[in-house]
Curated annotation (Swiss-Prot):
PTM notes: Ubiquitination promoted by PHF23 leads to proteasomal degradation.
Stated role: E3 ubiquitin-protein ligase that mediates monoubiquitination of TSG101 at multiple sites, leading to inactivate the ability of TSG101 to sort endocytic (EGF receptors) and exocytic (viral proteins) cargos. Bacterial recognition protein that defends the cytoplasm from invasive pathogens. Localizes to several intracellular bacterial pathogens and generates the bacteria-associated ubiquitin signal leading to autophagy-mediated intracellular bacteria degradation (xenophagy).
Reactions that this protein is recorded to catalyse: S-ubiquitinyl-[E2 ubiquitin-conjugating enzyme]-L-cysteine + [acceptor protein]-L-lysine = [E2 ubiquitin-conjugating enzyme]-L-cysteine + N(6)-ubiquitinyl-[acceptor protein]-L-lysine
Tissue specificity note: Widely expressed.
Stretches annotated zinc finger (RING-type): 679-714
Assembly and binders: Interacts with TSG101. Interacts with PHF23. Interacts with FUS.
EC number annotated for this UniProt entry: 2.3.2.27
Record localization: Cytoplasm
Keyword Repressor: no
Protein's name according to its UniProt entry: E3 ubiquitin-protein ligase LRSAM1
Positions of the SAM domain: 569-632
Chain segments carrying region Disordered: 227-248
One GO MF term attached to the UniProt entry: zinc ion binding
Amino acid sequence: MPLFFRKRKPSEEARKRLEYQMCLAKEAGADDILDISKCELSEIPFGAFATCKVLQKKVLIVHTNHLTSLLPKSCSLLSLVTIKVLDLHENQLTALPDDMGQLTVLQVLNVERNQLTHLPRSIGNLLQLQTLNVKDNKLKELPDTLGELRSLRTLDISENEIQRLPQMLAHVRTLETLSLNALAMVYPPPEVCGAGTAAVQQFLCKESGLDYYPPSQYLLPVLEQDGAENTQDSPDGPASRFSREEAEWQNRFSDYEKRKEQKMLEKLEFERRLDLGQREHAELLQQSHSHKDEILQTVKQEQTRLEQDLSERQRCLDAERQQLQEQLKQTEQSIASRIQRLLQDNQRQKKSSEILKSLENERIRMEQLMSITQEETENLRQREIAAAMQQMLTESCKSRLIQMAYESQRQSLAQQACSSMAEMDKRFQQILSWQQMDQNKAISQILQESVMQKAAFEALQVKKDLMHRQIRNQIRLIETELLQLTQLELKRKSLDTETLQEMVSEQRWALSNLLQQLLKEKKQREEELHGILAELEAKSETKQENYWLIQYQRLLNQKPLSLKLQEEGMERRLVALLVELSAEHYLPLFAHHRISLDMLSRMSPGDLAKVGVSEAGLQHEILRRAQDLLAVPRVQPELKPLENEVLGALEPPTAPRELQESVRPSAPPAELDMPTSECVVCLEREAQMVFLTCGHVCCCQQCCQPLRTCPLCRQEISQRLRIYHSS
């Protein structure tokens, strides 16, 4: 047996069954039976021991589980002291507790289909035990104390490794049925074991020197009587009393089955009510999702209004500051000009006398220099003529030598260049062949590795999923709004406006909560897509070659939803209208109800609500656009989708140019204009991280690593989210 093992976690259905059975056992007027079978238990829960001890249960049914031991830690066998029937068959028990003899009133013990290798010696203390079933275990011998079971009627030791019976079994005079593997027995001999229970008992009594009496001469206590401890030697009416006992037990078990069936019906009714409640909860959850978008739009409008007020105030302050700076600049310029003029006048007066003196000195110095230069010039020309003649001869000789060296070097270089070019061509050809071989090898490896193909298919599936794309776009929009709110909050802190600061904080908290919810929805959608991938993998043929490559190609060649709807008969202008209003998720509803532009022009907002369009602003905008389209005699150029636009109709669309304030877009533009702000820690890089749960965007990726609290609000950081600025 392994020293360490992982406990199996029960399934949801098994957990519900356990809770239901425990509740039944604790109800007022419940019977003496505790049934926790088929609950996938790895150990008996503490609550079951407490229930048996407090409510004095007499029957404990724990079959068909994963038990490896009867007693878990911190539990005592004395809690089951009132148990008369203990059913433990179809488990994984390897041994029974050594103090099993403490269950003095136990009458039925069933441990069939387990892994028992031995029985405890204390089993002989179960003086009221009448049925012992150890079938299909790994027992090799029986303890001698088995002969002390004075009330034992039925003993089943078949499908074990037992070859010898203890002689003490002859003292069990009440044994009526003994089941064993007769051919595998050594003692008693196989022919004796095959003759039946009476023959085995006669053989053991003869070996022990006892007289054999049939079990019908001994009267056993009834199962439900608590006072009897030993057998009583009385020949008065044993058969009739035994039949009455059997009938009484049959009646009790039939009543138990009826009550069990009644409880099962009650359980089904409870599950039906639970399912109804879950449906109502799903409807409420859907309504909450619609309210989220409305809240987001309201927050955005309020933020826009606040930004306009702030920008107006900022413009006033900038104008005043600029006016003041102009005045200061003019004053400084006038003062500087006056000082400059004074300095210039003073300087001219000082230098007037110095200039005259310096001019005279310069004239004298120049005359001296000119006289010296004339003499040196005459001497220098003689030397230059001699040097020029010598240089001419030297250069003519050098030029001939250089020309000869150049010719020889040019010839050698030409030869080397030819040989090196040929060698380089060979190397290039070899490198190109190696690259081609590596490329072919990589392509064949990618085609053969199903794991890489599966990962590529999963990535493409997530990329093309409409719901996942809409959640990503909403998360991107909220990140942009949080970045703008953080910048706005930093600016307003410098102005010390507490009322506006509180309003921005409330908006930021609302956006951060909405961002957390969208992250959960994104993770849930990814799990759903992963589940779909697992189903595909389970249904796929294991020997099919390139299965994931084929699935990837199918998904890649799959037409967009808008193109499918157009091929099915939906008008292109209607598809383009819904895509322009960022309502492409309503395309299946319009296609299902076969709605055209003519029908749409005659519909009211209430009719659209019945179809499934819940946003009031979007209803009015769709109806208005449809009427405008029908009023135009021909199709406008902007409503004619090109081929590439049809293929990309379900990509995140840009927002329409003219939308009423009541229209709520379901997806942000394809390219968000992400504002930039500097990190409040290093003041150098841009802020790239969103802190949850506060929602501030104030740090770069490098500075946020050691932080545990937000630098702006000092809130605990539970999660960090990276913002990727779109170029």
